[in-house]
């Protein structure tokens, strides 16, 4: 790595968007020796994004402000953790940043909003501080901070294995698909709870050998609907955590039922550990038309909804 003299001009502004993700496939294979679950997933970036702005500080402080007062801006926030990690790895202890977060991805929704914000911080401060870390190095830092963060940084369409940090890129789509995404704003689901409950219910089905894990990975790699993703052979959508969460979270049941009534939907599923759910469509126009038709029902149920195209790339500097 070659590091230039770090930037210290306090007026310089860098902006980065941090897109949400959905899980087109989430399979819990078994338990790893480190206690985490071994996963086989297909993750997809979508055009619902937080916005982050970064400025240098002359006194070396790192601070975070957010337009959503319910979100912690202290050291437990992945943005703050990512900033401190990057500064530590740079070797320049005098570096500081004032960070502003415009929160658009719902919190605790199974959309990796916090992980994406942390990944965006690595990209934004790498640019602001003129550090010149490579994409591979940034993905390594991201993996230290969270299982979803390497994907959030790389973005697009990816196979994700291990805890989710091992990425294999998929071919780019020729035409973007889209989703209608829906969440009950009053409900959140704890990811550790969801995986813990999965272990309680289904541990007897878990695979235990690496050879068995690899067999399932290869079966997913060879799925007919991959490479590239396409509307004429759409992903069947699968999420092992849906069988865990839906029976115990009524909002997920309601959301899936309303989504299943959307005209033109190709498939319906929960994302991640929930409670966000989505319906898949061949294109944005079809998704927008379906959302417009079903919007009164979503509103009556107190549900928030979005129409989001698939996003083909990861996190990039905007300025």
UniProtKB/Swiss-Prot annotation:
One of its GO terms (biological process) is isopentenyl diphosphate biosynthetic process, methylerythritol 4-phosphate pathway. It catalyses: 4-CDP-2-C-methyl-D-erythritol + ATP = 4-CDP-2-C-methyl-D-erythritol 2-phosphate + ADP + H(+). Pathway: Isoprenoid biosynthesis; isopentenyl diphosphate biosynthesis via DXP pathway; isopentenyl diphosphate from 1-deoxy-D-xylulose 5-phosphate: step 3/6. GO terms for molecular function: 4-(cytidine 5'-diphospho)-2-C-methyl-D-erythritol kinase activity; ATP binding. The active site is at residues 21, 148. Keywords: ATP-binding, Isoprene biosynthesis, Kinase, Nucleotide-binding, Transferase. Catalyzes the phosphorylation of the position 2 hydroxy group of 4-diphosphocytidyl-2C-methyl-D-erythritol. Belongs to the GHMP kinase family. IspE subfamily. This is 4-diphosphocytidyl-2-C-methyl-D-erythritol kinase. The lineage of its organism: Bacteria, Bacillati, Cyanobacteriota, Cyanophyceae, Synechococcales.
